[in-house]
Every structure is written in structure tokens, then in C-alpha cells.
Amino acid sequence: RTDFGTIHFLSILLTFKPNDMKTLRFIFLFATLFLFLQAGSFAQKLPNIHILATGGTIAGTGTSTTGSSYRAGQVAINELISAVPELKEIANITGEQIVKIGSQDMSDEVWLKLAHYLNELLQRKEVDGVVITHGTDTMEETAFFLNLTVKSNKPVVLVGAMRPATSLSADGPLNLYNAVVTAGASESVGRGVMIVMNGSILGAHAATKMNTINVQAFQAPNSGALGYVFNGKVH
């Protein structure tokens, strides 16, 4: 990252021509301290993303890495986060478990709990966006409901997986990474609630599950995707 204010300030320092070693040492120490503080401020600019876990296939475990039999909602949020160490490079991550269910068991009670909590959570200055891990069976219904009831311009992203966490080629880790990228992107502000699956960013009003097997399970057939995530960037 290039900070032209920093470059300008250092160029001014370099114009000084001290005639004694004490002054030269002071300028050197001051410049070093300034650069250290600037580096710290850059590190703090990572977005603060809070992850709410509800269970689903993304947190599922199976008896076989190649089989299709599994139990949803078995992996806790801290394990999901730990499984994707790259998350710490793109955001300051916090997380909490809301429920541990398959999304076929999603209820009005959980929906209302999520809506009330999100409206409170998104008012906090230290929260820049929220990711919700969710089963895919009722993900579109949850997204649509939250899009109507959450009153904030901050990004809210639902994410899931078509393969359990113990699968040989689990899609959950990359989906979670892409969801955090999306929740922390300036392009996502004011877009409403979104679903991120298999690199596609879909609006809650248009997303629907079109396939029960393929990792490209969600589409927005009437409006198309809002965008996509590629190489850790929102496009």
C-alpha cells in the first residue's frame, strides 16, 4: 500500500541537514517511531467480521471421507475458523455459536433470534460485517427473512456447503473464506443480505437452491449474481 502522506512527511524530514550527531540521531529515531506507528495503523485496518454459526452441512461430520452420509451441525464455530487459518490475513475474526442444527430444523424462533441479535450487533462500531454459517436447505428462506428485518447497511453474508467438513474435498473452507472476503469488502456495503456459495455472490431477494448435489447449488435465475469472489477479491 502506498501512503502519499507518509512519503511527503518523510521527504520533509530528509530535507533537514543536521550539523551534529545528536540531532541526526533524534531525526532517525523519530522517523523510525513514525513508521512503526504507521505500520500498526495499517494492520488495524483489517475489517472486523463476526461469524454466527447455526450448524448445517458446513459443520457436518461423516463416517467416511468419500461417502455421502453425515450428521449436520457437529463442528463448533471455533473449529470452523481454525480450519481456515488464512482468515486472519483478511479480517479480524470473532465468532459465536447460535444453534447447532441442520437447516431443515430452522424455526421461526431461531429466525427471530437472529434478526434481533443482528440489529443489535450491527450497531456496534467495532463490527464491520457479519457472516452466518447455515445449512443450505433453508438458506434462501433465512436470507430473505433477514433481508426484510435487518436494518443496517453493513454486509450480512450467509454461507454454507454442499459437502461436510470431513469430506475429501469439502467446499466449506473456501466458501467461508469467500464469505468473509465479501463481508469485509467496501463493495458489499448497502447491498442487503447476501448468499456466497462456490464463489458467487447472490442477493437474498433472488437466490434459490437449484441443485442438491453440485457445489454450484445456488443461482439467481431471474436477476443473475451480484458479483463473484476470485483470488480473495470481490468483483
Feature-to-residue mapping (PLM):
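Intrinsically disordered, low-complexity segments enriched in small/polar residues
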Residues: 1-3, 38, 65, 71
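Boundary at the C-terminal end of the N-terminal hydrophobic targeting segment
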Residues: 39-43
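Short intrinsically disordered, low-complexity coil segments enriched in acidic
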Residues: 1-5, 35, 232
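Short hydrophobic targeting helices and cationic amphipathic motifs
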Residues: 4, 9-13
